Amino acid sequence: MPLPGNVIQNSSIDAQTLINDAPLSRYQWLIAIICFLIVFVDGIDTAAMGFIAPALAQDWGVDRSQLGPVMSAALGGMIFGALLSGPAADRFGRKVVLILSMLVFGGFSLASAYAGNLDTLVILRFLTGIGLGAAMPNATTLFSEYCPDRIRSLLVTCMFCGYNLGMATGGFISGWMIPAYGWHSLFLLGGWAPLALTVLVIFVLPESYRFLIVRGGDTEKVRRILSHIAPERVQGVTHFHVPEETTQGASKNSLAMLFSVKYAKGTLLLWLTYFMGLVVIYLLTSWLPTLMRETGASMERAAFIGGLFQFGGVVSALFVGWAMDRFNPHRVIAGFYFVAGVFAFTVGQSLGNPTLLAVLILCAGIAINGAQSAMPALSARFYQTQCRATGVAWMSGIGRFGAVFGAWIGAVLLGNNWTFTDILNMLLIPATAAAAAVFLKSLVSHTDAP
């Protein structure tokens, strides 16, 4: 069936409208798979230290409270990496930042396997974290810019669940890898996997077409990219544009734009929400295997329970993304945060029943990881192209202070003889704060970018 003549004959076309009108192509699915794999290996490496900690403490003869700096080092690096990578990606491109970040976290993860003491490991995990912090938000940003508006939240949330799946996979496989091959093996896996994937990113993954358009890139390059998605629509087109290119311009400083009248309130509330959510997630991710060992669980069972918590985010991704595209996305996420706090509280009351404990940990993982996985999608749809990578990355970077705090406060509470039940009960506070912050954003700054 021929397309209307004015579509083919126009010399200029809105590239986002082209994406919105076309069915999802194999090319977009390929981009989704590559970005999924990027955040998957990011998740494995991010979670590695939490699963390694019990074996490392035993091997090196150190007390669990001494592991606090090691547990937090990668998170500190992730802050640094995220804050730098966002503006860099908005200036130089998403793809080049992705390549560099994967080389960094892959290389230093390999080096971590050969660390001989805690001080060396702290340095190597910090450097690994720089790459980890840069990779995840930029993969999210790049993929979101290839999604049609009608299902963007669903697709981005499903892609981002690769992060949770990676963290869960780290837990499941560490249960047999560490006893069989030693704690070094998980670092080796976390190093070689991203280095191998970098080859695919270099030769297959395209740059964001929106970035190329806004930065005044080569029209022919944009045409080649979009021809994989809607070949019949780009014939004869001499200029591609996107809404914000014509209405906002491309010369503004991306970081300054986050604090403009349009974005300032929403930016601060996104940061607060992400911060509080990561307090909950990283306290549990970093210390759940160790805490489970303290209750008498075997290393294999402790790793399995930790993996089960992360797997919950994979289970909820489809529903959360679907709901965000159909209802107020802020209130969907707020509901998941609050329910997560309730489940964390009930987990603390169920330590004597292993079966019920596993079910409740899965439910807590479904709620908190589902909410947190949806935040990059919410951020990506809030900011326009000129500051999208910066917005997503700075939410991730500032939020990582919550991750550092969560990992650190776990060591402090354990050192002060808090029980597992006490710690889990306390998590209701940051979970409720996250729910309140994102709900408030729905009232004061709800508008999506064009």
Language model segments and positions:
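A membrane-interface helix-boundary motif in multi-pass transporters
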Residues: P179-W192, L414-I429
